[in-house]
Amino acid sequence: MIEVSGLSVRLSGKSIISDVTFAAKAGELTAIAGPNGSGKTTTMKAISGELAYDGSVRIGGDEVKGLKPWQLAAVRGVLPQASTISFPFTVREIVRMGLTSGLNLHPDKSDQAAAAALASVDLVGFEGRFYQELSGGEQQRVQLARVLCQISEPIVDGKPCWLLLDEPVSSLDISHQLTIMTLARNFCKRGGGVIAVMHDLNLTALFADRVVLIKSGRLAAAGSIEEVLTDATMLSVFGCALRINQIPADGTPFVLAHSALSCP
């Protein structure tokens, strides 16, 4: 479990996150959503150990700020919102970086691991291409393949591992959005945990178990999809009169964006 309690972050003397509390369970996909600039990425960076914070963030009972970088790398992989690489690395070289930063449970099968990770994100045959030559969506999938090489198994020594994904489908077409979200969902089904910053509320409703809504750096709501995705909460958090409907087959909520045409 990842337990976030009283999380607060200040950057350049300004409060960005204030007193955020929630828990993410292994075996579940927890989505973090909210308006632009609400503090979602800052929250994720604090959870991953990239930013100093007040309060508590625990992974498997261990305080994140007390763990060394190599200890964090062994239990969580991070997909950043954007990645800029100055040197002309090939796709293969980028993906293999994940093998050097994680546990690399099978060092004798490094090439196979890299190939399998690329195949899982639909990039077979891209190994020799230069990263800078790829489209934004292709680069995003390369970075996810790197993360999958770092955290290759959802459970290691009886303890769950985590994928921390910041807007993992923001640059992807609908087909690859479904591919990546299904991959994340399957990681959870195998016992691992996923926290993903999401903007698409319908993908969130389709794939997430729980959702955390952040507004202006504070927790606005947290709970199951059915508990959080309500007309009243959408109006309160996003300022839009969004209508939440349900798919007849299984009752999964979905957001009817057309209902917000009156949104200022």
Curated annotation (Swiss-Prot):
The gene is hmuV. ATP binds at G34, P35, N36, G37, S38, G39, K40, T41. Residues 2-241 form the ABC transporter domain. It is a peripheral membrane protein. Keywords: ATP-binding, Cell inner membrane, Cell membrane, Membrane, Nucleotide-binding, Translocase, Transport. This is Hemin import ATP-binding protein HmuV. Its main location: membrane. The complex is composed of two ATP-binding proteins (HmuV), two transmembrane proteins (HmuU) and a solute-binding protein (HmuT). Its EC number is 7.6.2.-. GO terms for molecular function: ATP binding; ATP hydrolysis activity. Pfam families: ABC_tran. GO terms for cellular component: plasma membrane. Part of the ABC transporter complex HmuTUV involved in hemin import. Responsible for energy coupling to the transport system. It is found in: Cell inner membrane. It is an enzyme of class 7 (translocase). PROSITE patterns: ABC_TRANSPORTER_1 (PS00211), ABC_TRANSPORTER_2 (PS50893), HMUV (PS51261). SMART domains: AAA (SM00382). Belongs to the ABC transporter superfamily. Heme (hemin) importer (TC 3.A.1.14.5) family.
